[in-house]
């Protein structure tokens, strides 16, 4: 189940990335850069520390329950939430990377949240708890339910006439990606059911005291390595 699930997720990621490649050709990067500079100048108050730090996290995930974005952390740490409505993935990515750079230049601590389908390159959400601000991408995949402080529409940075020429291909990508994700989720459900069935047999034989001891030993080793800088 796991290997098949990964293959379906890879296929979905490829289709979504193809839509991004189409959309980025219809997106005005200079307009996004100007908007990001204005927004940063208004909102990002520089601190007196030497430099800002960046933590990398996942806020969204694919689970047996479907696609989930964990918004409790956002609501706890940030009271001003900018929602970026973007169904194509180009404008939001460019905007978030520009805001990330500006926030770090202002020596602010940030939390960068990447897309689980493209974890090394697609910045999906950005949180800046020190100023109570978050920038959250919304689309048919993220399933975000948050009350926005402001809403930013990707259309304002997009040549919609040019984008409509590729409407058929985008529609195909969208439907096919949805089917790939649905199948991946179905396989996750199947894998969990198999795990639960197996667990019924071995759980009563588990020595949890030994498990906890091994966990503590492993954590101690990790801590020792990190303290030595190795």
Question: Which residues does each predicted region cover?
Answer:
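Conserved nucleotide-sensing/catalytic segment adjacent to the nucleotide-binding pocket
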Residues: 1, 101-182
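Charged, amphipathic alpha-helical linker segments immediately N-terminal to NTP-binding catalytic cores
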Residues: 1-61, 162-164, 182, 197, ...
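A contiguous, basic/glycine-rich beta-loop/short-helix subdomain that forms a polymer-engagement track
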Residues: 58-73
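Glycine-rich phosphate-binding P-loop
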Residues: 68-71, 77-103
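Extended, charged coiled-coil helical stalks used as long, distance-spanning scaffolds
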Residues: 175-182, 186-192, 196
